[in-house]
Regions:
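Conserved beta-strand positions in the Rossmann-like core of class I SAM-dependent methyltransferases
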Residues: 8, 27, 147
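A short, Lys/Arg-enriched amphipathic alpha-helix followed by its capping loop at the start of a domain
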Residues: 15-26
Length: 151
C-alpha cells in the first residue's frame, strides 16, 4: 500500500492512527460527529458503537471498508453494507475475557457478603459463547459447581 487511502477513525479507538497511518491519511474525529459530508470521499471508516452506520451516513460515499471496534453490530445496517458492496469487520469476543473476569469478581463480592466459601457456591451459565465459555473455564479452575444451559 502506498499510503494513498483516506481513513476516518473515531478518536477513542486506541492506537488507530498508529495502526492505520501506514495505509493512508488518518483523520481522528469524535465518533458522535461522524456524518455523511465528513466521509463522502473516505475509503475506510473505523467506528465504535456511538456511530450509527446506515444509509443516511453512507449514501453516495466512496467507502470501501467499515471496521467497528465493537463486539456487537446493533449500530450497523449490515444489509445496507452488503447491498453497497462495503466490506465490514467487527470484533466479536474482544471484551469477553474482561466481562468473564467481571462476572467472577461479582461472585467474589457475593462470597464476601454471604460468607459462603467458593467450594459451596454454584454458578449458572446460560450459553457458551465468547463470555460463557470463559466464565466456565475460570469457574472450573476455582472449583465452583457449574449448572449450564446451552440455549
Amino acid at each position: 500500500m502506498t499510503g494513498s487511502l483516506s481513513i476516518v477513525a473515531d478518536e477513542q479507538i486506541p492506537l488507530a492512527e498508529q495502526a492505520f497511518s501506514k495505509f493512508g491519511n488518518v483523520t481522528l474525529v469524535d465518533g458522535r460527529s461522524i456524518n455523511n459530508s465528513l466521509i463522502k470521499n473516505t475509503d475506510i471508516l473505523l467506528v465504535r458503537s456511538v456511530t450509527k452506520v446506515n444509509e443516511l451516513l453512507l449514501k453516495n460515499s466512496n467507502l470501501k471498508f467499515l471496521g467497528s471496534a465493537t463486539s456487537g453490530v446493533d449500530h450497523i445496517d449490515i444489509d445496507y453494507l452488503k447491498s453497497s458492496k462495503i466490506y465490514f469487520s467487527y470484533s466479536p469476543g474482544s471484551n469477553s475475557q474482561s466481562v468473564a473476569e467481571y462476572v467472577l469478581n461479582s461472585l467474589i463480592v457475593a462470597k464476601k457478603k454471604s460468607c459462603i466459601p467458593f467450594s459451596k457456591m454454584k454458578v449458572g451459565i446460560i450459553g457458551f459463547g465468547h463470555i460463557g465459555s470463559k466464565v466456565k473455564k475460570i469457574s472450573i479452575e476455582e472449583n465452583l459447581v457449574i449448572f449450564s444451559c446451552i440455549c
